[in-house]
């Protein structure tokens, strides 16, 4: 889950365990704050 923080900073998803956020974190390019 913490891959989020190393990919981008996103207030709504960073550190989140919600499946939609986890998927975004794994993709690294679905967050506009990339």
Curated annotation (Swiss-Prot):
Its main location: secreted. The keyword Secreted applies. Contains 4 disulfide bonds. Expressed by the venom duct. It is found in: Secreted. One of its GO terms (cellular component) is extracellular region. It comes from the Eukaryota. The keyword Secreted applies. GO terms for molecular function: ion channel regulator activity; toxin activity. Keywords: Disulfide bond, Ion channel impairing toxin, Neurotoxin, Secreted, Toxin. Acts as a neurotoxin by inhibiting an ion channel. The cysteine framework is XXII (C-C-C-C-C-C-C-C). This is Turripeptide OL127. It comes from Iotyrris olangoensis.
